[in-house]
């Protein structure tokens, strides 16, 4: 009985852990990725050298075997190669355009931003009939904040009257300049 339970536990752990240990062949995956990267880089460099002639390299002098050293003869007929040079040029051009357009978008792409934009639009559509004026009782001279809304002429008159009264009655003391600062 003990042997059966140990065997079942061993088979269960082997079935559970066996999926991770029997992974795909990593050197072949590396070769495929390397070939794909080398081909795309070679196409870009080839296109750049043909569009900007520098005299250092020519299209005919660059062999394709130096670009991908792990390339087998059986992998050369795969879909990684472009059928003609114009398709490679289009792919390079699209790649460069996508790199330049990455910083163009300033908006937010999260769902919360969409919700905030929608709420703002609803607020704008429903509040068009409201006016931006303060209520009448707040605008009156007895309303809130009237001291801060006094006209400049009233402020200057009140300060000149107060300062002339102070100069005629008493000499300025040590606290006179502080009291002037706190007056409005």
Curated annotation (Swiss-Prot):
One of its GO terms (biological process) is vascular associated smooth muscle cell development. One of its GO terms (molecular function) is hormone activity. Transmembrane segments: none annotated. InterPro entries: Adrenomedullin-reg_peptide (IPR051665), Calcitonin/adrenomedullin (IPR021116), Pro-ADM (IPR001710). It comes from the Eukaryota. GO terms for cellular component: cytoplasm; extracellular space. Coiled coil: none annotated. This is Pro-adrenomedullin. It comes from Mus musculus (Mouse).
């Amino acid at each position: 009985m003990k042997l059966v339970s140990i065997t079942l536990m061993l088979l269960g752990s082997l079935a559970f852990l066996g999926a991770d240990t029997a992974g795909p062949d990593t050197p072949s995956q590396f070769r495929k990725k390397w070939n794909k990267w080398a081909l795309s880089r070679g196409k870009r460099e080839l296109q750049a050298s043909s569009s900007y002639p520098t005299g250092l390299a020519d299209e005919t002098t660059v062999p394709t075997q130096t670009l991908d050293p792990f390339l087998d003869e059986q992998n050369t007929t795969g879909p990684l190669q472009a059928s003609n040079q114009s398709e490679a040029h289009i792919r390079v051009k699209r790649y460069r355009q996508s790199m330049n357009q990455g910083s163009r978008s300033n908006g937010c792409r999260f769902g919360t931003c969409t919700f905030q934009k929608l709420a703002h639009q609803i607020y704008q559509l429903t509040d068009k009939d409201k006016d931006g004026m303060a209520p009448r009782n707040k605008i009156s001279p007895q309303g809130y904040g009237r001291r801060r809304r006094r006209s400049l002429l009233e402020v200057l008159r009140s300060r000149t009257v107060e300062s002339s009264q102070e100069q005629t009655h008493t000499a300025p003391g040590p606290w006179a300049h502080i009291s002037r600062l706190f007056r409005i």
